[in-house]
Amino acid sequence: MKVLVLNCGSSSVKYKLLEMPKGDVLAQGGVEKLGLPGSFLKLTMPNGEKVVLEKDMPEHTIAVEFILSVLKDDKYGCIKSYEEIDAVGHRLVHGGEKFSNSVEITPEVIAKVEECIPLAPLHNPANLKGVVAIEKLLPGIRQVGVFDTAFFQTMPEHVYRYALPYDMCNKHGVRRYGFHGTSHRYVSARACEILGLDYDKTRIITAHIGNGASIAAIKNGKALDVSLGMTPVEGLMMGTRSGDVDPGVLTFLMEAEGLEAAGISELINKKSGVLGVSGVSSDMREIEDAIKNGNERATLAMTMYDYRIKKYVGAYAAAMGGVDVLVFTGGVGENQYTTREKVCTDMEFMGIVFDSKVNEGMRGKEMVISKPESKVTVIVVPTDEEYMIASDTMTILK
């Protein structure tokens, strides 16, 4: 079964064509600068070669149409006919409280996703444009929506509810939703598969650490808690997002700096986090270079970043009454050994006995980085959200 996975953002469309159930990647790439001058499609050939194809793509339907044409292209493609594509799976960011599982996309589902647009005003409209584009370009093909938020619908009310006026929260849908759910679901299940553990009887902490970052507590196969909240700003310090901050600071700054709501939103989403503290960059590779050159603010930013992760690991271990597996994933989690080491150092009291030597040589592959005597297994699992979306698509449509 060939499944095309689409992840449509406001100015990008990422895609992967997978042969299921094995998960072999037949084609992958993405459109960038969609709707802007200089838009292009970057694709990865089977031999790893990167190819850039420039084309004016003012909107999503034209971008998806170009992707489909490249999939069938004699030089760059891998299929002879669009009929070879059996189904399309979409990343849908926000399903609110309406979706606790992946679903086949119908007019009723589209209407419910549209109702969630106020909760994700940038993402949901873009996601739906991909659905509409496929309906137009491949009429009759079945489509499945996989929600970032669905995995966390198992959180109990005392976890997802904020300590704000009860009726006001209900009126506006204010609660913890969590994001990166597809990634947390994949790496937690994959870790148990690698380690030979029963997913439904294991306490797992998953750390999805990249430019955006979140930590989840997964107990006996169900999400118990997650650091991201109603929006993707809460929790860990991120590339440009603040993470946890005293809400009173925001009202103080509104008065002190003369900021309106839009200004505060830009501050905590785009000007804070690692970038805001370091004054250097939101890219951890550039931060590491700055640290080597003696930049004190870059050093401070990195120390804060690592500390926040460690604090959440401890909190979630307490919330679950212990932990059996700690998983690192995401761009930083998979590739930056220094962050993994800082998080896991001096954690013997919690059952973590870390193997610094193995950790230092480990980048971007599945690997246990704790010692055999460690009561908590620490493991790196590269995330594969596209495989998870394709897997859900196959399961639902079978």
UniProtKB/Swiss-Prot annotation:
SUPFAM superfamilies: Actin-like ATPase domain. It catalyses: acetate + ATP = acetyl phosphate + ADP. Transmembrane segments: none annotated. Keywords: ATP-binding, Cytoplasm, Kinase, Magnesium, Metal-binding, Nucleotide-binding, Transferase. Pathway: Metabolic intermediate biosynthesis; acetyl-CoA biosynthesis; acetyl-CoA from acetate: step 1/2. Substrate binds at R91. This is Acetate kinase. It comes from Porphyromonas gingivalis (strain ATCC BAA-308 / W83). The gene is ackA.
